[in-house]
Every structure is written in structure tokens, then in C-alpha cells.
């Protein structure tokens, strides 16, 4: 039997905690036998003293084990259970293509996703732009969809990593969110509860990233790869660029539209294609569905070209209570904004920088995201035809097309777009879509 205050004291004095001590504390968070003050105290000691790799693995696994851990063995699936997690960005719609693409190649993708957070869009919010789409099927239905379709994208239920929910809420109000061991534990507890064979992490870098610097993004990616592999799940990470909006659109319905167009081949933004393919390649190799990069790319290109990936997406939408002909008739179903018109720069030049975070917040301000949990979302608003870094801007080329609910909202968004996009008289050096691959 342990005492919570003795565990806090031990960590406060700079000592490593044992697996048993960490499990006792995390189970106490779940059972409400540990107070909020004690959670806050431990979080702050971890913030200042960090954690060893064994401590990080123990923390993650204890939080994973605080609730249900999905087990797929009884389904006798003929492929690996694989998933991707992104630290979030603007126009980051990769999940909607990646899940169906990997499923079409023989993987099973039980993706448990989140809502928008701050300036970043949420996969669940995007999917809810589809009429009838059910993000909370019951456990049996979730398993059926994975077995039949190969991919389902759902919301986190209260049975998955419940200790994390309480731990995170306390961190949020005690300035201890940005601790790498605590971020790692929080992300991986939920992902590892999916019962995965392999995971790929997409850690964003740049002006729209969760971590403020390249070095911190890299440190987080390395921590996640180390802890997840330590917990027995084959994991790699990619550092990908978020110095500009990833897709050509940012919002909810507008990003779903772009995802369908990507899958059908109607339109594929080159950077979005690069990042999506790179993540899918990792999933195929880690899931042992391809032996190397070349084989993985060949398989992925084939399921895009033959329509199989688009078909899987359509079947997922139908299985989750969306329209059965969504892929064929997406424009019939997706909401459209009252006012859609282009915004132009006041000067001419090359786009040299973009405040991606500010562009994400502009979508939130239009009603496309939440400032607080109780807010309702306007799924129709957002940006399309986003200009890219290096584009030559003049009176002919707009910075973006803004989809807004009224003129006042459009004007406010136009002001934000102009302020967020910096023009220069010479083109910037182009940045890669993927900076680095991190393995154990």
C-alpha cells in the first residue's frame, strides 16, 4: 500500500518512481481516491524533474490500463491493426484518406479521433459535416465495421483511458500541459488502448504546430517513438511541415469535400499527397503489409487509381449512418455557406510566410470551431483555394476563397487572412513536406 503524498515527495526530491507507485497513483486518479491537489502536485514535479524512459512507459501503460483495452483476437482478422495520430494542424485532413487507403491495402484501422482543439481542426467535427454520420457507434458495431469495412473513425468513449481525462483536466488549469512525458502519456494511453500492432505519429513543425519549435517537436516525436515501442507497439514518427495550411482548404465541410476529391482523383493538393502517402507508407511497412517504401507506394497508388480507397471511404460513411451515395454525390449532402467570395492581397509579391495558427483561429472565429466545449459548429464555413508559400500574388490570384455566414463575418476573416499571409519581393526557399523520419 502506498501513500499518494509519499509518491509526490519522492518525485519532488528528484527520484524515479517504480512501476507499482505509478500504477497506484494512476488508479487513484481513475477511482477518485487521489485529490485534484495531489494530481496537480505530481504533474508539477514531473514538469520540473522530467521522467526516465521506464517511468514514461509505466505512466503510459498505467493510463492505458485504467480503462478498456480493445482486443481484436476473437475477430481473426487477416491483417494488422494499425493507426496514425497527428499532433494537429490546419487543413490536416489526412485521416480521411489515410484510413481508407490503408484499409484498401489490407490493414485494419480502428481510428479513435478527437474534436478541434484551439486553432487545430478536429477529425470528428469534419465527419459530422456529413448528414447522419455517427461518431459514437456502440462497441459491437465498431468491431463489426472494422471487420467488414476495414476502417472506422469514432470518438473517444468514457471507457478508454479514463484516468487521462481527469489528469489532463488538472494539467490544463495548472500550467503543466507542455511537459513531454505527460503529453506522451496522454497521447499514447488513448492510442494504445485501441489494441494496435503498429502506430505512426505525425508530429507537426512550424507556425501552425502544437509545439512551438522544431527542437521541441523533434523531442516529442522521439519520446513517443521510444515509449510506444517500449510498450510493445511498433511505432515510427514523421516530422511534417505546418508552416502553411496543409490542404487547399481549412474548415469542416470544405475539407471533407477535398478528401473525397483526393480519393477519387478529381483533385490532389501536392503537399497533402506527399504527407498522406508518407504516413500510409509507414503504416504499411510497420504493419508488415509492404517490405519497403517502393512496394508500399505501389500498393497505395494502385488503390487510389482503381477506386478501391474511395469505395472503402464510401462504405465507412454508409456503415456509420451517413448517405450510401456520399462519394458520388458529396455536393448534394455537404452544407454550403451563405457567402463565398475571394479575398485578394493589398500588394503584390511572393508569399514568404504564413501564420498558420492565425488562419486556424480565423476559421474558429467564423464559427468553424469551438472556443468552449458547449459551442455549436457551423460546418459550412472555412477557406478553399488557399494560396501556398512561394505563390506569386497579384490582382488575379486570390489569397483564398472565404466561405462565411454573412458579410460581417467575411470581412473579419478577410482581415485575418491578409494579416496572416506575408508577401515579399522574392520567392522563399521551399521547405520539405516531411522533414525527418524517426525510428527507435
From Swiss-Prot:
The enzymes which catalyze the reversible phosphorolysis of pyrimidine nucleosides are involved in the degradation of these compounds and in their utilization as carbon and energy sources, or in the rescue of pyrimidine bases for nucleotide synthesis. NCBIfam families: PRK05820.1, T_phosphoryl, Y_phosphoryl. Pathway: Pyrimidine metabolism; dTMP biosynthesis via salvage pathway; dTMP from thymine: step 1/2. InterPro entries: Glycosyl_Trfase_fam3, Glycosyl_Trfase_fam3_N_dom, Glycosyl_Trfase_fam3_N_dom_sf, Nuc_phospho_transferase, PYNP-like_C_sf, PYNP_C, Pyrmidine_PPas_bac/euk, Pyrmidine_PPase_CS. It is an enzyme of class 2 (transferase). GO terms for cellular component: cytosol. PROSITE patterns: THYMID_PHOSPHORYLASE. Its EC number is 2.4.2.4. It catalyses: thymidine + phosphate = 2-deoxy-alpha-D-ribose 1-phosphate + thymine. Belongs to the thymidine/pyrimidine-nucleoside phosphorylase family. This is Thymidine phosphorylase. GO terms for biological process: pyrimidine nucleobase metabolic process; thymidine metabolic process. SUPFAM superfamilies: Nucleoside phosphorylase/phosphoribosyltransferase catalytic domain, Nucleoside phosphorylase/phosphoribosyltransferase N-terminal domain, Pyrimidine nucleoside phosphorylase C-terminal domain. The gene is deoA. One of its GO terms (molecular function) is thymidine phosphorylase activity. Keywords: Glycosyltransferase, Transferase. HAMAP family: Thymid_phosp (MF_01628). Homodimer.
Amino acid at each position: 500500500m502506498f501513500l499518494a503524498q509519499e509518491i509526490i515527495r519522492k518525485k519532488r526530491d528528484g527520484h524515479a518512481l517504480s512501476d507499482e507507485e505509478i500504477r497506484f497513483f494512476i488508479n487513484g486518479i481513475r477511482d477518485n481516491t487521489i485529490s485534484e491537489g495531489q494530481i496537480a502536485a505530481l504533474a508539477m514535479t514531473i514538469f520540473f524533474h522530467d521522467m526516465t524512459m521506464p517511468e514514461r512507459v509505466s505512466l503510459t501503460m498505467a493510463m492505458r490500463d485504467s480503462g478498456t483495452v480493445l482486443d481484436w483476437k476473437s475477430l481473426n482478422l487477416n491483417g494488422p491493426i494499425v493507426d496514425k495520430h497527428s499532433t494537429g494542424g490546419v487543413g490536416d485532413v489526412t485521416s480521411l484518406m489515410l484510413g481508407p487507403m490503408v484499409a484498401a491495402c489490407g490493414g485494419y484501422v480502428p481510428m479513435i479521433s478527437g474534436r478541434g482543439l484551439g486553432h487545430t481542426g478536429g477529425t470528428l467535427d469534419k465527419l459530422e459535416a456529413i448528414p447522419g454520420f455517427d461518431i459514437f457507434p456502440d462497441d459491437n458495431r465498431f468491431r463489426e465495421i472494422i471487420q467488414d469495412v476495414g476502417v472506422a473513425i469514432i470518438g473517444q468513449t468514457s471507457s478508454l483511458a479514463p484516468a487521462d481525462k481527469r489528469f489532463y483536466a488538472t494539467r490544463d488549469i495548472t500550467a503543466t500541459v507542455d511537459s513531454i512525458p505527460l503529453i506522451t502519456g496522454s497521447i499514447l494511453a488513448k492510442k494504445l488502448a485501441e489494441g494496435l500492432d503498429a502506430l505512426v505519429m505525425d508530429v507537426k513543425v512550424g507556425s501552425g504546430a502544437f509545439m512551438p519549435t522544431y527542437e521541441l517537436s523533434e523531442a516529442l516525436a522521439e519520446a513517443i517513438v521510444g515509449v510506444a515501442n517500449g510498450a510493445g507497439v511498433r511505432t515510427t514518427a514523421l516530422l511534417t511541415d505546418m508552416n502553411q495550411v496543409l490542404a487547399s482548404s481549412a474548415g469542416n465541410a470544405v475539407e471533407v469535400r477535398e478528401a473525397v476529391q483526393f480519393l477519387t482523383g478529381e483533385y490532389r493538393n501536392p503537399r497533402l499527397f506527399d504527407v498522406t502517402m508518407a504516413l500510409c507508407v509507414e503504416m504499411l511497412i510497420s504493419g508488415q503489409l509492404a517490405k519497403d517504401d517502393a512496394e508500399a507506394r505501389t500498393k497505395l497508388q494502385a488503390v487510389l487509381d482503381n477506386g478501391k480507397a474511395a469505395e472503402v471511404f464510401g462504405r465507412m460513411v454508409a456503415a456509420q449512418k451517413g448517405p450510401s451515395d456520399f462519394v458520388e454525390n458529396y455536393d448534394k449532402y455537404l452544407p454550403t455557406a451563405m457567402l463565398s467570395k475571394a479575398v485578394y492581397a493589398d500588394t503584390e509579391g511572393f508569399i514568404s510566410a504564413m501564420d498558420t495558427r492565425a488562419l486556424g483561429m480565423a476559421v474558429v472565429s467564423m464559427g468553424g470551431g469551438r472556443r468552449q466545449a458547449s459551442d455549436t459548429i457551423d460546418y459550412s464555413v472555412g477557406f478553399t483555394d488557399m494560396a501556398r508559400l512561394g505563390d506569386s500574388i497579384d490582382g488575379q490570384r486570390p489569397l483564398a476563397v472565404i466561405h462565411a455566414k454573412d458579410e460581417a463575418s467575411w470581412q473579419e476573416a478577410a482581415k485575418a487572412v491578409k494579416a496572416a499571409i506575408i508577401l515579399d519581393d522574392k520567392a522563399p526557399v521551399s521547405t520539405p513536406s516531411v522533414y525527418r523520419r524517426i525510428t527507435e
